[in-house]
């Protein structure tokens, strides 16, 4: 289970040093094998391989005749990269994925249960500002009656 927010720096070889709290879960859940892919929100998604496999199976079963599902499948499956975390807990992010998410030196990691989102720092701050600007009336119906 991934939760919490952390800001980390890419090293000179564009490797992401995975924080210990996420690293331990990746080692337990996937033996350090991860899948990193693009997200429509212009961030990256990092999954332990066993978490990604059923998602990929569902995505590839979707029809290519619906342009919207085909586009989503092209994005999520097309950008997916299998990556092995090294012994120091680093993940080498492919140039195509770094470019897609506009990742530079500082990367924000956001735990989201079964996955971790990787954000450009400025884009993450804008995302948080947008989330804070929602009014109660604008909440989706799924959240009605939800309390913290």
UniProtKB/Swiss-Prot annotation:
The lineage of its organism: Bacteria, Pseudomonadati, Pseudomonadota, Betaproteobacteria, Nitrosomonadales. It comes from the Bacteria. Residues 5-51, 80-123 form the SpoVT-AbrB domain. CDD domains: MraZ_C (cd16321), MraZ_N (cd16320). This is Transcriptional regulator MraZ. Forms oligomers. NCBIfam families: division/cell wall cluster transcriptional repressor MraZ. Pfam families: MraZ (PF02381). Disulfide bonds: none annotated. InterPro entries: MraZ, MraZ_C, MraZ_dom, MraZ_N, MraZ_sf, SpoVT-AbrB_dom, SpoVT-AbrB_sf. GO terms for biological process: negative regulation of DNA-templated transcription initiation. Belongs to the MraZ family. The keyword rRNA-binding does not apply. Gene3D superfamilies: Transcriptional regulator MraZ domain. Keywords: Cytoplasm, DNA-binding, Repeat, Transcription, Transcription regulation. GO terms for molecular function: DNA-binding transcription factor activity; transcription cis-regulatory region binding. It is found in: Cytoplasm, Nucleoid. The gene is mraZ. GO terms for cellular component: cytoplasm; nucleoid. It comes from Thiobacillus denitrificans (strain ATCC 25259 / T1). Signal peptide: none annotated.
């Amino acid at each position: 289970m991934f939760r919490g927010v952390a800001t980390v720096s890419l090293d000179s070889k564009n490797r992401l040093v995975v924080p210990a709290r996420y690293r331990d879960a990746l080692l337990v859940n996937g033996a350090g094998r991860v899948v990193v892919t693009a997200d429509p929100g212009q961030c990256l998604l990092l999954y332990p391989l066993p978490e990604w496999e059923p998602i990929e199976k569902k995505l590839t079963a979707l029809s290519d005749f619906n342009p919207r599902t085909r586009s989503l499948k092209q994005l999520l499956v097309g950008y997916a990269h299998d990556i092995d975390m090294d012994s120091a807990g680093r993940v080498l992010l492919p140039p195509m994925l770094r470019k897609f998410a506009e990742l530079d030196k500082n990367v924000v990691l956001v735990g989201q249960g079964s996955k971790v989102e990787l954000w450009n720092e400025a884009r993450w701050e804008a995302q948080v500002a947008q989330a804070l600007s929602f009014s109660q009336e604008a909440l989706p119906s799924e959240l009605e009656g939800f309390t913290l």
